[in-house]
Regions:
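Generic structural concept
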Residues: 354, 358, 386, 390, ...
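A glycine-rich phosphate-binding loop feature that marks nucleotide/adenosyl-phosphate handling sites
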Residues: 125-129, 292-294, 344-348, 379-384, ...
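Short, solvent-exposed positions on alpha-helices
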Residues: 67, 355, 403-410, 454, ...
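Aromatic-residue-lined binding/catalytic grooves and analogous aromatic/hydrophobic interfacial grooves
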Residues: 366, 405, 450
Length: 513
């Protein structure tokens, strides 16, 4: 059986997750569910990045210890992932003892190889990013250096610290980016490659003085320092599947891994991560999937921008996790930023889920119950419907294997529209025995339900159980293979949402938290 390891970034739990976190996590979950559906053995990892100055300050603000703070926030994140029906196999925390041991051992090994050394450093530092910015990387606001991500003033820091010899890996990183297809879409690899060629690679700090950042994993040979949060966090991808602790499981899954990240952390996940892996004699990941930003009010959605959209708003408004997941995945774009408005999300939900899919399921279910007492036996499927089903399945599998979830959903919608056109043309409600038409419609609904199941797992389960069919791999789907549909109810899956009040500008914006 083919193995696949899927990861999200691990998230800073300094605040509850919002739509930006959900955007990444739901996409990774859809990939995991799809790959399980087609028969692959999947291990899906997500979790929290729990060390560093930002966490330390957040805990101080609440008057509790960092450990108490991250314990509380781990529970919060897990609750949100339950809310969105995220099917992770393991939730990693960088305060887990096994992870801390792996990080400590990796740091020690690189020091013994001469790849980590001690030196003085001075530079502009962003607490939120937990990294230094060199000239050319930060932006000037009123002649003061600001973080290009968070738009906050940078802090000038001078300290003696430990460095990783990133500069020694320029040729390796260049070759990896230019000669492999690891980074997807490939435009992101070109972006990093251009920067590497223009600027070269500088050695990077991998530790902080303990008197400034006490909340971290101690440097194993120097207790006056803690390990830099990015070095610590990146290693979760290997510690989470057994590196240095369970070699059999590590070998089972690595390097057949799909990392899913946002483009804001591209540099660390290419240049730094690939170099760390090479330094530790670990093969690079099979795929680094990079997605664009969700934009609201012209800015990347984020707490610092004050434009976050709460996850609970999405789940409540779109009738549960399935509706929220579908809207996010239809918006999903790997290489173009997406402007988010309630009007846009409402339109997607109402037209595609409530009307095209939900209404069709309801109409066919009610008709079958009324006309044939819910029992629809196998008949020859209408040729046009059969062709539409097979075309949609073929394109859907191609798109999903190519990691293009939104495009795959468009193929499902085309089939849904064809089925709605068919029911209006053949008018089964006017026939005394519409079994042939109903069977064709039910085969189409079965195909749509199978294809939507990674995105709308709860609704797909309800429909398959209510109509009496199994959710099979889209690769194994055979039109006309169901002997009998036994419809026990016609569920109302997705109730339409009503327009909210408009803002003074006339355009509706989601609530922020």
């Amino acid at each position: 059986m083919e193995r696949l390891y899927i990861t999200t970034p691990i998230y800073y739990p300094n605040a509850p997750p919002h739509i930006g976190h959900a955007y990444t996590t739901v996409y990774a979950d859809v990939l995991a569910r799809y790959n399980r559906l087609v028969g692959r053995k999947v291990f899906f990892l997500t979790g929290n990045d729990e060390h560093g100055l930002k966490i330390q300050r957040a805990a101080e603000k609440e008057g509790i210890t960092p450990k108490e703070f991250v314990d509380k926030m781990a529970g919060v994140y897990r609750q949100y992932w339950v809310m969105l029906n995220i099917s992770y196999d393991h939730f990693i925390r960088t305060t887990d003892s096994y992870h801390e041991k792996v990080v400590s051992e990796a740091f020690k090994r690189l020091h013994e190889k001469g790849l980590i050394y001690k030196a003085k450093y001075a530079g502009w530092y962003c607490v939120d990013c937990e990294r230094y910015y060199s000239p050319g990387e930060y932006v000037l606001v009123d002649d003061k250096p600001h973080c290009p991500i968070h738009n906050k003033p940078l802090e000038w820091l001078e300290e003696e610290t430990y460095y990783f010899k990133l500069s020694e890996f320029k040729d390796y990183v260049t070759k990896t980016l230019s000669e492999t297809d690891i980074v997807y879409p490939p435009s992101y690899a070109k972006e990093v490659l251009n920067r590497v060629q223009a600027e070269g690679l500088r050695d990077v700090s991998v530790a902080r003085p303990k008197d400034r950042v006490a909340w971290g994993i101690p440097v194993p040979f120097d207790p006056d320092y803690t390990i830099y949060v990015w070095f610590d966090a990146l290693l979760n991808y290997v510690s989470g599947i057994g590196y240095l602790t369970d070699d059999a499981r590590f070998q089972e899954y690595w390097p057949n891994v799909h990392h899913v990240i946002g483009k804001d952390i591209l540099w660390f996940h290419t240049v730094v991560w690939f170099s760390l892996l090479k330094a530790l004699d670990i093969s690079p990941p099979r795929r680094l999937i990079v997605h664009s930003f969700l934009i609201n009010r012209g800015l990347k959605i984020g707490k610092s921008a004050g434009n976050v959209i709460p996850i609970e708003f999405l789940v409540e408004r779109y009738n549960g996790s399935d509706g929220a997941r579908y809207v996010l995945m239809k918006l999903f774009n790997l290489d173009k930023d997406v402007e988010v408005t309630i009007d846009l999300m409402d339109s997607i939900y109402n037209s595609e889920l409530a009307d095209t899919y939900g209404n069709l399921v309801r109409r066919v279910g009610v008709l079958a119950a009324k006309k044939v007492k819910g029992k629809v036996y196998r008949r020859d499927v209408d040729k046009k419907i059969e062709e539409s089903i097979e075309t949609a399945l073929g394109k859907y599998v191609e798109d999903m294997e190519s990691l293009e979830v939104s495009k795959a959903l468009s193929e499902v919608q085309e089939l849904g529209k064809a089925l709605n056109t068919y029911i209006n043309e053949v008018k089964p409600w006017e026939k005394s025995d519409p079994s042939k038409e109903l069977y064709s419609l039910l085969e189409g609904i079965r195909a749509v339900t199978v294809m939507l199941s990674p995105v709308t797992p709860r609704a797909s389960t309800v429909i398959s159980e209510s109509f009496g069919f199994k959710l099979v791999s889209p690769r194994d789907f055979k039109v006309g293979s169901v002997e009998r549909y036994n419809i026990v109810e016609a569920p109302i899956l997705f109730r339409k949402v009503q327009a909210r009040r408009e803002s003074q500008s006339g355009e509706e914006s989601p609530p922020s938290s």
